[in-house]
Curated annotation (Swiss-Prot):
It is a single-pass membrane protein. The chain crosses the membrane at residues 278-300. It comes from the Eukaryota. Residues 1-138, 190-228, 406-673, 685-748 are annotated as: Disordered. Residues 8-60, 241-277, 316-413 form a coiled coil. Residues 43-59, 710-723 have a biased composition (Basic and acidic residues). It holds the Pfam family KPWE_dom. This is Peroxisomal membrane protein PEX14. Residues 1-277 are peroxisomal. It is found in: Peroxisome membrane. It comes from Dictyostelium discoideum. Keywords: Coiled coil, Membrane, Peroxisome, Protein transport, Translocation, Transmembrane, Transmembrane helix, Transport.
Length: 748
């Protein structure tokens, strides 16, 4: 009864299990689609979470990163049990093998997936199915493709390349990511055929399942035996223990496999990240490529495409613009021609006026040259005549000195004879005090009127003396018969207070100034002359001066006073003629004798002055004229004891000349120059600048015989200035030719 109960229970259990399995399969078929969708979403979330964790780890310090890695490993060690689907139990005979059960291989992931509730297997078939499902993970791989990938990766030429390039190449060849991972694992482990261990495990599990099935059949057949039941229970316990051990071994293998997968996933993710990182080289390359393409397109469109499309319009516009430009240029050319013609006409008019001015200037220059040549010739002639005249004047002065001495002696002798012959007197003269006064002339005239002239004796010679004074500068003195005062030894002009009109020093050089010899030389010469009348001097021709020393203004205030600059020169002519007249008898009159004695005393006191007449000469055209008048009323006769009847006539001419030259200007306006040429040379040697020399021009010679012209240059004279260059430089060649042609036609 016990065995029957057990069998019935087993049958009931099997039926219940089959029913449950059928229900579960239906439910699983409905929920597989939902599970796949959930897995896809969870994988996306896990990828996001992994990226965030990596970013956080990169930002954290290295010590904290190591601590977190250790915690992650500890958390990943407990792994969920593998999902195992129940299978339907079929009735089979004792000699037949159980049919192959459908195996479902769950995809392993890092995250825990919610699984349906699992029931503990009641038979050995469930354990064999679990072990089969665990130990066959590579049923979805294509072994041929995996082996080819392993051979490719083991190639020595490929080992040195980057892993990202290897993975990309294998994916191009058609391998899935799982196959690539499997190939990489086999390359790392060195096992080309990675299914050996799995096959050995599978064979062991199959042998165990067969033994279980055999035992299970025997138990059913021998249910009546209690001993067999006890043995079966013990055997079940042993099988359960072995099964637990196998599960633990499988779990360790699965954990190691999961770790490898995680490491591979991390490597692949890093490679993908490296490929997706931003690189400046690629950015610059792309930017340059875009810019080059854009510039090329712009060039093509602007130069080829647009002109090709708008060819007709552009040609028309260009032709219209060219016509406008040509018309504007023609108008400008016409305007320029008109302006050039106007300027040419204006220039011709200006050149005509300039030509007239140039001709006038040339005429003035020629006149100045002629005047300069005439002045040089006249100056040379006057200098030669002056030198000859000075020599003649000196000779005449010597003759005058001799005559004056002879005349003084003769007057003394005549006075003595008059005193002895009783009332034989001579004419009375007034002294000359430097200024010819009218009172002296009146006195002379009264004396001449009151004088009684005795007839000359026939045996006595008659002496007539005529003195002529000539002033060479043009004067306003009338040609009247006036007596000339005698030559005095002292300076008759000491009482005058005349000075130069300015405070400047005299301009006349030293060699041209008045000599410092006093007029006392004349007295010395008079003393040396012999007082005899028997040897008269040889007659000389009266001299007429032919040069001009001044003008009428040399006399101060328009009066008849003489100037200091005038040099008195006297010329004396003596002629002796025989007289056939009878001597007149002297009249005896006491009154007249007394008067004559007084007159003789006055004559002795006045140094026996002679009767002279002043004749003024006008020197306007460098031709002097000497006009002399003799005063016959002043003739005196004296008896002589000699038998010779001779008459001695002496003519004295006094010429007063001026020391100023013809071309002298006003003395106050001239600049003072040095009086000595040697002083000027010494000043130049010492580096000084004498007066009258310009200092604003630096033309000192250098060592190389060149002259350094400073910035300060002498301003150009009007005839030296070139005023036409500024006008002619702006002319064209045609205008200059037309002007030259007009000049040649005008000259013809």
């Amino acid at each position: 009864m016990d065995n029957d109960d057990i069998n019935n229970n087993n049958n009931n259990n099997n039926n219940n299990n089959n029913n449950n399995n059928s229900q579960e399969l239906d439910q699983q078929e409905q929920t597989q689609e939902e599970i796949t969708k959930q897995r896809i979403q969870k994988r996306k979330e896990e990828a996001k979470r992994i990226m965030e964790e990596r970013k956080k780890r990169e930002q954290q310090p290295p010590s904290q990163r190591q601590y977190e890695d250790v915690e992650d490993d500890q958390q990943q060690q407990p792994i969920r049990p593998i999902k195992q689907l129940p299978q339907r139990q079929q009735q089979y005979d004792d000699n037949d093998e159980p049919p192959q059960q459908q195996q479902y291989e769950p995809k392993i992931s890092q995250r825990k997936v919610p699984l349906p509730p699992m029931k503990q297997p009641t038979t050995s078939s469930t354990a064999s199915a679990a072990t089969g499902s665990i130990l066959s993970p590579s049923s979805n791989f294509r072994e041929d493709m995996v082996k080819k990938a392993v051979l490719f990766l083991n190639n020595p030429n490929v080992k040195n390349t980057a892993l990202a390039r290897k993975v990309a190449y294998l994916e191009k060849k058609g391998l899935t990511s799982d196959e690539v991972k499997e190939a990489l694992k086999r390359v790392e482990t060195g096992n080309i055929n990675g299914s050996s261990t799995n096959n050995s495990n599978i064979t062991q599990s199959n042998s165990i399942s067969r033994t279980r099935n055999d035992n299970y059949g025997n138990n059913n057949n021998n249910s009546s035996n209690n001993n067999n039941n006890i043995q079966q229970q013990q055997y079940y316990q042993q099988q359960q223990q072995q099964h637990q051990q196998q599960q633990q071994m499988a779990l360790t293998q699965i954990q190691s496999y999961q770790k490898r997968l995680e490491a591979d996933d991390q490597r692949i993710a890093q490679l993908m990240m490296n490929n997706n990182r931003f690189s400046w080289n690629s950015f610059l390359f792309s930017v340059t490529a875009i810019v080059g393409a854009a510039s090329g397109l712009a060039y093509l469109t602007s130069n080829y495409i647009i002109p090709f499309l708008n060819g007709g319009k552009t040609n028309k516009d260009a032709s219209a613009n060219m016509d406008k430009k040509i018309t504007s240029l023609q108008e400008e050319i016409i305007k320029l021609q008109s302006t050039i013609i106007q300027q040419g006409n204006d220039f011709r008019e200006s050149t005509k006026s300039l030509k007239t001015l140039i001709e006038q200037q040339q005429q003035q220059i020629l006149q100045q040259q002629q005047i300069n040549s005439v002045s040089t010739t006249t100056n040379s002639a006057t200098s030669a005549s002056n030198s000859s005249e000075i020599v003649e004047i000196k000779k005449e002065l010597k003759n005058l000195i001799n005559l004056i001495g002879n005349k003084e002696n003769s007057n003394n002798s005549n006075n003595n004879s008059n005193n002895s012959n009783n009332n034989n007197g001579y004419s009375k003269y007034n002294g000359f005090n430097g200024v010819y006064n009218k009172s002296s002339y009146d006195d002379v005239s009264t004396n001449n009127n009151n004088k009684t002239n005795s007839p000359p004796s026939p045996n006595k010679p008659t002496t007539t003396t005529t003195t002529t004074a000539t002033s060479t500068p043009g004067s306003n003195i009338s040609n009247t018969n006036k007596t000339l005062p005698p030559i005095i030894k002292t300076n008759p002009y000491s009482h005058l207070s005349w000075k130069l009109p300015t405070d400047q020093p005299p301009v006349i050089p030293s060699w041209q100034q008045k000599s410092s010899n006093p007029p006392s030389d004349l007295s010395n010469a008079n003393d040396k002359s012999s007082p005899s009348n028997s040897n008269p001097s040889t007659p000389t021709k009266p001299y007429q001066s032919s040069f001009n020393y001044g003008d009428v203004n040399s006399f101060v205030g328009g009066s008849n006073t003489l100037n200091f600059d005038e040099k008195p020169t006297t010329t004396t002519t003596t002629s002796t003629t025989p007289s056939n007249e009878r001597p007149s008898s002297p009249s005896v009159n006491n009154n007249n004798n007394n008067n004559n004695n007084n007159n003789n005393n006055n004559n002795n006191n006045n140094n026996n002055n002679n009767n002279t007449t002043i004749a003024s000469t006008s020197n306007e055209s460098n031709n002097s004229k000497v006009e002399t008048t003799s005063n016959d009323s002043d003739k005196s006769t004296s008896p002589s004891s000699s038998s010779n009847n001779t008459t001695s006539t002496t003519a004295t001419t006094t010429t007063i000349t001026s020391a100023s030259t013809e071309d002298n200007k006003q003395q106050s306006d001239e600049t003072p120059y040095s009086s000595d040429f040697l002083d000027v040379i010494n000043q130049l040697k010492q580096g000084k600048t004498p007066p009258g020399i310009r200092t604003d021009i630096d033309d000192k010679p250098l060592e190389n015989s060149t002259v350094t012209k400073s910035a300060k240059e002498r301003p150009k004279k009007p005839w030296e200035r070139d005023t036409l260059t500024s006008v002619t430089n702006n002319l064209s060649v045609e205008e200059t030719q037309t002007i030259n042609n007009t000049d040649s036609s005008v000259e013809k």
